[in-house]
Swiss-Prot record:
Interacts with CHC1 in a Ran-stimulated manner. Interacts with XPO1. Interacts (via its C-terminal R domain) with SMAD2 (dephosphorylated form via its MH1 and MH2 domains); the interaction results in the nuclear export of SMAD2 and termination of the TGF-beta signaling. Interacts (via its C-terminal R domain) with SMAD3 (dephosphorylated form via its MH1 domain); the interaction results in the nuclear export of SMAD3 and termination of the TGF-beta signaling. It comes from Pongo abelii (Sumatran orangutan). One of its GO terms (biological process) is protein export from nucleus. Phosphorylation at Ser-58 promotes its import into the nucleus. Residues 274-289, 476-494 have a biased composition (Low complexity). Its main location: cytoplasm. Acts as a cofactor for XPO1/CRM1-mediated nuclear export, perhaps as export complex scaffolding protein. Bound to XPO1/CRM1, stabilizes the XPO1/CRM1-cargo interaction. In the absence of Ran-bound GTP prevents binding of XPO1/CRM1 to the nuclear pore complex. Binds to CHC1/RCC1 and increases the guanine nucleotide exchange activity of CHC1/RCC1. Recruits XPO1/CRM1 to CHC1/RCC1 in a Ran-dependent manner. Negative regulator of TGF-beta signaling through interaction with the R-SMAD proteins, SMAD2 and SMAD3, and mediating their nuclear export. The modification Phosphothreonine is found at residue 56. It is found in: Cytoplasm; Nucleus. Pfam families: Ran_BP1. Residues 461-471 have a biased composition (Acidic residues). This is Ran-binding protein 3. The modification Phosphoserine is found at residues 32-33, 40, 58, 151, 260, 280, 282, 299, 466.
C-alpha cells in the first residue's frame, strides 16, 4: 500500500494559481467515493489526500511542499504526525540537515582565556615577585552552559582536547616543581609583618650582615616600602619631639612676653632663678611650672596696676534747699499739666514727690511746700507753696487735681498728680489738713482787724494789711500780685 501511494502521488505538486486559493474547498455532496473525489481534485490542481490514506502513507511520503502546506492549513492533522520525526523507508532522508538549517541557535560563546590579572594572586611571591608563566595553573574547564550551546561537531573536537591538556599540565607541573620553593609561597597582605617590617637600626644591621655575606643582595629598604615609610615617620617624630620643646605653651615665660614695668626685686629673683637653673641643669616640667605660675600672677597684677586708670571725682556737697525743712510724705507719682490751648493733659514727668514743712521766722507759723524731681536726672518739675486759697480736688481714687505755681512760666496752672490709691489718699489728707489750717489763720487775722483802729496802732495795721495781701495774692485776678508772689517763692526755695 505504501508503494502504491508513493507511485500514484507525484513528488512535485502541481502549480497552484493565486486566484484559485479562495475557491471553495469543500467536497460536493455527489462525490461519495474517495477515489472520485481524488480524481476531481487532481484535475483542479487542489489535490488533498484523504485522512485515512495520509495515515498509511505519512511514514513513506516526502515532506510536503510549500504549496501543499498552504492548502492544507485548514485540515486537522493527527497529533502523532510531527514533521521531521520519521524518515521515509524508500528514499534517503534529508530531514536532519534541513532541521539543522531551519533551527535558529544562539551564538556559540567560547570560554574567555585567563589573563595576567587573574594569575597575579596565585603566582605572586614574597614582596610582589611574580612566578613564571609556565607554572601557572591549567586553563579552567568550560562551564556546562557553554558546553550545551556548542554544536555536536565542536563537542566532539573538545573530547579530544582533554587528553592533550592533561599531558601538557603534567609536564607544566613537573617544570614548576623544579623551580625554587621560596618563590612558590604566595604573598598575603598583612601576614608575617614581624618578619618583614623591622625598625631602622635592626634593618640596617641586618643589611650590613647580608651585604658582608652576600654582596649581591639588595638592602631591605630598597625593596620593602614599609621600612621606607617607618624610617621617614621615625625621623619626623624625632624632629617633632625636638621642636615640641620650643612650642608656645600658654602661661609659660610670661615675664618675657608680658610688657610690664619690672621691679627690682623681681629682676633679681629672675636672675637668681636663671643662674640656678643653668647650674643645676635641666629640670622636670612639673618643677618648672610652680615658679612660672607665680611669675605669671605677679606680672598680671603689675600689668593691671599699670594700665588701670581710676577716675575718682571729687566729693561735692549737695545742696537741695531742703536742709531746713522736715519731710512729711514722699511717694512715686506722675505729674500732668493742663494745657488751655489744646484742652488736654500734658505729661510733665515722673519721679519723687515730697511734702515738706518749715517753721516761719516771723511769727512761728507752719509753712509747707510741694517739691517734685524727675527720676534719674533729678530735674525740678514742681516747686510750690501751700496757701489758703489753693484749690485741691480728688479727681479719682488714684489722682488728685490741684492748683499750683508753674516754675517755668511763673503762672498759676492746674496740675494732676497720678499715683497709687494709698499714696493718693495720704497726700490728699495731708494737703487738705494744711490748707484748712492756713484758712483758719487768715480768718483769725481778719477778725482781729474788725475792731476800731487805734491811732498808735495804725502803722501796725498797715503792715498786717500788707501781709494779708501777700497771702491772698495767688487767688487774685491781678497778674502783678501773682508775679510778686512767684518771686518770693523762688527766692525762698533757693
Amino acid at each position: 500500500m505504501a508503494d502504491l501511494a508513493n507511485e500514484e502521488k507525484p513528488a512535485i505538486a502541481p502549480p497552484v494559481f493565486v486566484f484559485q486559493k479562495d475557491k471553495g474547498q469543500k467536497r460536493s455532496a455527489g462525490s461519495s467515493s474517495p477515489e472520485g473525489g481524488e480524481d476531481s481534485d487532481r484535475e483542479d490542481g487542489n489535490y488533498r489526500p484523504p485522512v485515512k490514506r495520509e495515515r498509511t502513507s505519512s511514514l513513506t511520503q516526502f515532506p510536503p511542499s510549500q504549496s501543499e502546506e498552504r492548502s492544507s492549513g485548514f485540515r486537522l492533522k493527527p497529533p502523532t504526525l510531527i514533521r521531521g520525526q520519521a524518515p521515509s523507508a524508500g528514499l534517503p532522508s534529508q530531514k536532519p540537515k534541513e532541521q539543522q538549517r531551519s533551527v535558529l541557535r544562539p551564538a556559540v560563546l567560547q570560554a574567555p582565556q585567563p589573563k595576567a590579572l587573574s594569575q597575579t594572586v596565585p603566582s605572586s611571591g614574597t614582596n610582589g615577585v611574580s612566578l613564571p608563566a609556565d607554572c601557572t595553573g591549567a586553563v579552567p574547564a568550560a562551564s556546562p552552559d557553554t558546553a550545551a550551546r556548542r554544536s555536536p561537531a565542536e563537542a566532539a573536537d573538545e573530547e579530544k582536547e582533554p587528553q592533550k591538556n592533561e599531558s601538557s599540565n603534567a609536564s607544566g607541573e613537573e617544570a614548576c616543581e623544579k623551580k625554587d620553593p621560596a618563590t612558590q609561597q604566595a604573598f598575603v597582605f598583612g601576614q608575617n609583618l614581624r618578619d618583614r617590617v623591622k625598625l631602622i637600626n635592626e634593618s640596617m644591621d641586618e643589611a650590613d650582615m647580608e651585604n658582608a655575606g652576600h654582596p649581591s643582595a639588595d638592602t631591605p629598604t630598597a625593596t620593602n616600602y614599609f621600612l621606607q615609610y617607618i624610617s621617614s615617620s621615625l625621623e619626623n617624630s624625632t624632629n617633632s619631639a625636638d621642636a615640641s620643646s620650643n612650642k608656645f605653651v600658654f602661661g609659660q615665660n610670661m615675664s618675657e612676653r608680658v610688657l610690664s614695668p619690672p621691679k627690682l626685686n623681681e629682676v633679681s629673683s629672675d636672675a637668681n632663678r636663671e643662674n640656678a637653673a643653668a647650674e643645676s641643669g635641666s629640670e622636670s616640667s612639673s618643677q618648672e611650672a610652680t615658679p612660672e605660675k607665680e611669675s605669671l600672677a605677679e606680672s598680671a597684677a603689675a600689668y593691671t596696676k599699670a594700665t588701670a586708670r581710676k577716675c575718682l571725682l571729687e566729693k561735692v556737697e549737695v545742696i537741695t534747699g531742703e536742709e531746713a525743712e522736715s519731710n512729711v510724705l514722699q511717694m512715686q507719682c506722675k505729674l500732668f499739666v493742663f494745657d488751655k490751648t489744646s484742652q488736654s493733659w500734658v505729661e510733665r514727668g515722673r519721679g519723687l514727690l515730697r511734702l515738706n514743712d518749715m517753721a516761719s521766722t516771723d511769727d512761728g507759723t507752719l509753712q509747707s511746700r510741694l517739691v517734685m524731681r524727675t527720676q534719674g536726672s533729678l530735674r525740678l518739675i514742681l516747686n510750690t507753696k501751700l496757701w489758703a486759697q489753693m484749690q485741691i480736688d480728688k479727681a479719682s481714687e488714684k489722682s488728685i487735681r490741684i492748683t499750683a505755681m508753674d516754675t517755668e512760666d511763673q503762672v498759676v496752672k492746674v496740675f494732676l498728680i497720678s499715683a497709687s490709691s494709698k499714696d493718693t489718699g495720704q497726700l490728699y489728707a495731708a494737703l487738705h489738713h494744711r490748707i484748712l489750717a492756713l484758712r483758719s489763720r487768715v480768718e483769725q487775722e481778719q477778725e482781729a482787724k474788725m475792731p476800731a483802729p487805734e491811732p498808735g496802732a495804725a502803722p501796725s495795721n498797715e503792715e498786717d494789711d500788707s501781709d494779708d495781701d501777700d497771702v491772698l495774692a495767688p487767688s487774685g485776678a491781678t497778674a502783678a500780685g501773682a508775679g510778686d508772689e512767684g518771686d518770693g517763692q523762688t527766692t525762698g526755695s533757693t
